[in-house]
Amino acid sequence: MIVILNNGGQYVHRIQRSLKYLDVPAKIVPNSTTLEEIAANPEIKGVILSGGPDITKATNCENIALNSELPVLGICLGHQLISKAYGGEVSRADSEEYASIKIYVKQENDLFKGVPSEFTAWASHMDEVKVTPDCFEVLAYSDICGVESIKHKEKSIYGVQFHPEVSHTEYGDIILKNFCKKCGFGFEE
């Protein structure tokens, strides 16, 4: 099972639905859920930190990003929380994104395996990662956001600023499937 920490984002149920379409069991839990509660459940194979409107109300997400031994994917606010937890800088975007945008993948990697180097994704945010932590690499960018996706250099921790769970995002199902593979789920190819 994948647990989705609910940070109050408008698309949190779409994350669960997208995983259901992949036949991956998922459960939405409050963002007050602790790392200890997650670690105590052997059915949980990965964690998704959802989007949301307020970084100050994302209770336990930074602790989970820093200390979880399970794979973690941050989406939108979740992506920003991961970066902030590791010493990155998050602030108001130069240009707010509420539209379909072009994403450019810098190089093939495990999160974007099977995804072309350029694709359209849905973005909906006012803040963004401005400085990436040293222990992360930038996987993708757009014309108006230099950090659309990141990966920890040693752990299975990923972040995407855009929304792979929204139907407007091309290859969003493949991106989510690739994360689920990192969590140990198998898929027939």
Curated annotation (Swiss-Prot):
The protein's name: GMP synthase [glutamine-hydrolyzing] subunit A
Annotated organism of origin: Methanococcus maripaludis (strain DSM 14266 / JCM 13030 / NBRC 101832 / S2 / LL)
The UniProt record lists the keyword Nucleotide-binding: yes
CDD domains, A to Z: GATase1_GMP_Synthase (cd01742)
Active site: 76 (nucleophile), 163, 165
Gene Ontology, cellular component aspect: cytosol
Oxidoreductase keyword on record: no
NCBIfam families: guaA_Nterm, PRK00758.1
GO molecular function: ATP binding; GMP synthase activity
